[in-house]
Amino acid sequence: MSNFNVGFVIFPDLTQLDFTGPLQVLARLPQSTTHIIAKSEAPVPSDCGLSLVPTHTFANCPALDLICIPGGVSGVIGAIGDRETVAFVRQQAGSAKYVTSVCTGAFVLGVAGLLKGRRATTHWAYTDLLSLVGATYEKSRIVKDGNLITAGGVTAGIDFGLSVVAEIAGEVIARTIQLGIEYDPVPPFDSGHPDRARAAVKSALSSRYEKANLALRAGIEQATIL
């Protein structure tokens, strides 16, 4: 395989694990170069306070073989309202072999016009909004529709990264990366999905996510969908 350009588009207030989870996996893809792309060279603050340093700007980014958009509701609302960001994503996706997202990053793809008529997933709290960008929700942690690969919320980015490596370089390489990062999750609680979480746990989050859902809906409705 010739050198494979992987690019993550970052923006203020993104959820860092949406980005750093798959980054840790895809940075180990053989014969690849990882690019971290933002509007400018300035450090980009994430939603947990960790600042991220771009390697490229929109102006000097090479053509990408894989483009990945992380999520984070506040950051995504800003990104979909920024025409330069949306245009860059659409332009790079036009020639990329793989167009991908983690969590609510799917809505950046959607506003860029890349989810129309496609199957996709996102964080469980926002799946009802996928239809606003022309996508059909598929209930799965990872959804592949042609060259479009979307992942569920936050930690799904690690599973996504391993799935993409298997797609590109084969299962053996993906398995060696999984072992190398000791990805063998055994969570202390079985509350990682609404289908399994107790009612009291879901109730504790309901107000927060209802407000976030409404905010993201408003952001999508105000955005110019390409």
Task: Give, region by region, the residue ranges found by the protein language model.
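Extended, subdomain-level signal for the structured scaffold at the beginning of enzyme domains
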Residues: M1-V99, A106-V111, T127-L129, Y137-K139, ...
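Thr-Gly-centered strand-to-loop micro-motif
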Residues: P54, K144-D145, A151
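Residues at secondary-structure transition points
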Residues: A79-R83, T121, G152
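Structural detector of well-ordered beta-strand residues that form the stable sheet scaffold
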Residues: V99-T100, T121, E138, I149
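Active-site-proximal catalytic alpha-helix in oxidoreductases
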Residues: T104-A106, I149-V165
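A conserved active-site-flanking secondary-structure segment within enzyme catalytic domains
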Residues: L115-I142
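Alpha-helix boundary/capping and short turn/kink residues
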Residues: A120, V154, E167-E171
